[in-house]
């Protein structure tokens, strides 16, 4: 199937690796970032700005959404100010929900097939010390993905929730176990394989973690 893909968080380490691996001769790929020189420039920390994506998704006939944008925090939640908390939830949870809504609405109204891939975290299934707000936002994404995936039986839109272990990225570069983390290129291969898979089985959620 040919997809018109919107990849959020294209400026990040994993986003760049996903971009490299998607077959541009087969799919139309549109990149999002909060900075210029990308197809869709939106600051997801601002919920008003997120609304700008509605027309973009409709005009480009987006039928594959990769919710990859995310922000990490391991601050104790009492040390985070209110704006930081809002920002984490807006980027990690609210933006994927609203973007999925726009795509879902456009595709279901036209009875078209589609795919939503939520790049989640193991922190969205297992609570971690000093990751209260980050983990809570990812738990929210897990719940949203689970609820939305129930509709797969009634719609033509697949929803896949990817719970990833820690990767070597800029966000994790200061962590003590950085050297033992997974390589983003390997994770990107998993995600691109999901796009290219044409099987009839429904994969609603899975985990990827380091075996070491």
Residue ranges of predicted features:
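C-terminal helical subdomain
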Residues: 161, 176-212
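Conserved NAD(P)H cofactor-binding loop of Rossmann-fold oxidoreductase domains
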Residues: 68-74
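N-terminal Rossmann NAD(P)H-binding glycine-rich loop of SDR-like oxidoreductase domains
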Residues: 11, 15-19
């Amino acid at each position: 199937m040919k997809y018109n893909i919107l990849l959020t968080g294209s400026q990040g380490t994993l986003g760049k690796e996903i971009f490299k691996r998607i077959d541009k001769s087969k799919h139309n790929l549109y990149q999002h970032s909060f900075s210029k020189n990308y197809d869709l420039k939106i600051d997801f920390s601002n919920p008003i700005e997120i609304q700008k994506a509605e027309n973009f998704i409709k005009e480009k006939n987006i039928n594959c959404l990769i919710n990859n944008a995310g922000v990490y925090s391991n601050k104790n939640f009492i040390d985070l100010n209110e704006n930081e908390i809002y920002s984490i939830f807006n980027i990690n949870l609210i933006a994927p929900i609203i973007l999925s809504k726009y795509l879902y609405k456009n595709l279901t109204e036209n009875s078209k097939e589609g795919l939503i891939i939520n790049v989640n975290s193991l922190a969205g299934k297992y609570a971690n010390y000093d990751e209260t707000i980050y983990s809570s936002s990812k738990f929210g994404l897990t719940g949203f993905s689970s609820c939305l995936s129930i509709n797969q039986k009634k719609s033509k839109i697949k929803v896949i929730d990817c719970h990833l272990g820690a990767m070597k990225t800029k966000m994790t570069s200061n962590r003590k176990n950085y050297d033992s983390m997974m390589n983003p290129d390997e994770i990107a291969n998993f995600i691109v394989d999901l796009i290219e898979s044409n099987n009839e089985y429904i994969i609603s959620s899975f985990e990827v973690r380091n075996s070491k």
